[in-house]
Amino acid sequence: MTQLDQLKQFTTVVADTGDFQAMRAYAPHDATTNPSLILKAVQKAEYRPLLEQAVRDARSDSVEDIIDAVLVAFGCEILSIIPGRVSTEVDARLSFDTAATVAKARHLIALYEARGVPRERVLIKIASTWEGIRAADQLRAEGIRCNMTLLFSLIQAVACAEAGVQLISPFVGRIYDWYKKDAGAAWDPIAQGGANDPGVQSVVRIYNYYKRFGYTTEVMGASFRNTSQIIELAGCDLLTISPELLAQLQQSDAPVERKLSPEHAHATNLVRLPADEAAFRWHMNADAMATEKLAEGIRLFAADAVKLEGLIGPLRAAA
């Protein structure tokens, strides 16, 4: 049995790509996208017709509306392949605007529903800022489920759980990158790999906290640099994995053991954290890694949104 098949015994496997042709071979249950992945996909020749059709289908000739149509078009194609849910991301430039995030999420869900997709099959991805978490809280009350992304700390996870969000995406690889860069020449990839990987440890801590205190918010590990990080999180509710790493898992038959479980989580000595706004901002301020990676992630996603707009401009003019 391949490592991928073994992993699926413990964890829901999610494809982390906008390239829906690439995900067919791995039979994922869900799929996630983000501005960077969509940008990468739309530059492939095979997706040009989909892009051009989205331009024609947009409700107006505004770039913003066309981008929304592109995101939903990709999401619908992905949903025709997978049995579960697709995550579609709100523009990162709205990360500090609760009202605008709520409005954009409602609009994206309306576009999906206009194409016959029930809202239960869509997760709206929102950056895990305080403002984004408040937006997710409002959207939950309307039956709109959210996937909180760019999550690098326990306090972000606790605030999301207290808001009752559907799912969080704690990042692994970007945390690993930060600590590796911070350590410089002192970094020891052997000593700080496997279960000692700081990104892995972050997700384990969050998973254990949720299970120990009975939160129903799903934990989906994300942002992997290698298959070792994935294997160390076997048993996590979900893991979203790039096609490249899915291929490596499919090509290996090395044993995979369950590492995370509710039973183990209940035996930990974790204590509850307050998660009001003051506590959230204080804990984030005290965590240089989480603060820097959240800000960087928002900047990178925003930059790719701008690049995507640049690709849309000529198509709009030609339509």
UniProtKB/Swiss-Prot annotation:
Species, as recorded: Ralstonia nicotianae (strain ATCC BAA-1114 / GMI1000) (Ralstonia solanacearum)
Catalytic activity from the UniProt record: D-sedoheptulose 7-phosphate + D-glyceraldehyde 3-phosphate = D-erythrose 4-phosphate + beta-D-fructose 6-phosphate
Described purpose of this protein according to its UniProt entry: Transaldolase is important for the balance of metabolites in the pentose-phosphate pathway.
Pathway: Carbohydrate degradation; pentose phosphate pathway; D-glyceraldehyde 3-phosphate and beta-D-fructose 6-phosphate from D-ribose 5-phosphate and D-xylulose 5-phosphate (non-oxidative stage): step 2/3
Name the UniProt record assigns to this protein: Transaldolase
Gene3D superfamilies documented for this protein: Aldolase class I
Subcellular location: Cytoplasm
Stored NCBIfam families: PRK12346.1, talAB
One GO BP annotation of this record: carbohydrate metabolic process
Keyword Nucleotide-binding appears in the UniProt entry: no
Keywords of this entry: Cytoplasm, Pentose shunt, Schiff base, Transferase
InterPro entries linked to this entry: Aldolase_TIM, TAL/FSA, Transaldolase_1, Transaldolase_AS
SUPFAM superfamilies: Aldolase
Domain of life: Bacteria
